[in-house]
């Protein structure tokens, strides 16, 4: 079964090569048939050039270089729909969740789940390393509670950049995705559930990197408003969903 690893990248020239080496080395040693797709989101640094150079050493690596910035959700969608794998994982360019965490997700695909998401929010589980600013901890907890009550019940952490989809789920969900920036993860999960796909949340190890985080305190109200719009669009039939 072929695996596609999609990596959205914006101004990641300092991190991307080490992440690519780690992913390729791991999958090669495990003899996993795979492709690695980096989708550059209008980066202002040398991210695309670094990936182009890495292709010489990593034969399974592909680059989609988008010249204008559209947002993480947009480039994840581009990568997912360009992928050829029966399984499709998106993961962050800073390697906050290392590829070996895939071993935690795969058993649930074998059990029949269609979407398996990495989480550091499950009760009784501790998967986070590194400190976060106090505002992110507070807003994160309040935001997750809000989401469970009003948007998508039963999911404790929607925001980890480590999500695995079957090809069937990916090709059904991503064409309906409207949100290109923050909150696209929530939209994907809402769409997956509405389309009848089985979702499993699994504890993973995640290392916070404050230097690579692009989230500001002012982003949280926008995030919540976008989530409310997802619910509104779903209720009013603006998503034309047919599984």
Spans of model-derived segments:
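Short loop->beta transition adjacent to catalytic acidic/histidine clusters or analogous donor-positioning motifs
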Residues: 1-3, 24-38, 46, 59-62
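Hydrophobic helical membrane-anchoring modules
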Residues: 1, 145, 150-153, 176-243
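A conserved acidic beta->alpha catalytic loop
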Residues: 40-49, 95
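Short, well-formed alpha-helical segments that are part of the catalytic scaffolds
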Residues: 12-27
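Conserved donor nucleotide-binding strand/loop of the catalytic core
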Residues: 34-37, 48-82
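Acidic helix N-cap motif at the loop->helix transition within catalytic regions
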Residues: 14-18, 45-54
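Acceptor/aglycone-binding surface of glycosyltransferases and processive sugar-polymer synthases
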Residues: 66-82, 87, 99-182, 208-215, ...
């Amino acid at each position: 079964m072929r695996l596609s690893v999609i990596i959205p990248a914006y101004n990641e020239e300092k991190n991307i090569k080490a992440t690519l080496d780690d992913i390729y080395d791991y999958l090669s040693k495990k003899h996993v048939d795979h492709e690695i797709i980096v989708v550059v989101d209008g980066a202002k640094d040398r991210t695309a050039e670094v990936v182009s150079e890495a292709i010489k050493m990593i034969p399974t690596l592909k680059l989609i270089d988008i010249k204008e910035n559209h947002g993480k959700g947009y480039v994840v969608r581009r990568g997912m729909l360009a992928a050829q794998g029966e399984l499709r994982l998106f993961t962050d360019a800073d390697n906050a969740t290392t590829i070996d965490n895939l071993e935690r997700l795969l058993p649930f695909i074998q059990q029949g789940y269609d979407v398996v998401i990495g989480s550091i929010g499950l009760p009784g589980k501790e998967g986070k390393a590194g400190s976060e600013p106090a505002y992110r901890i507070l807003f994160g907890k309040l935001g997750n509670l809000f989401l469970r009550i009003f948007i998508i019940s039963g999911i404790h952490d929607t925001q980890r950049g480590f999500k695995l989809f079957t090809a069937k789920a990916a090709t059904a969900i991503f064409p309906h995705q409207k949100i290109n920036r923050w909150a696209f993860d929530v939209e994907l999960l809402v769409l997956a559930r509405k389309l009848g796909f089985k979702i499993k949340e699994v504890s993973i190890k995640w290392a916070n990197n404050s230097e690579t985080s692009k989230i500001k305190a002012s982003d949280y109200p926008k995030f919540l408003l976008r989530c409310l719009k997802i619910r509104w669009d779903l209720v009013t039939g603006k998503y034309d969903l047919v599984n």
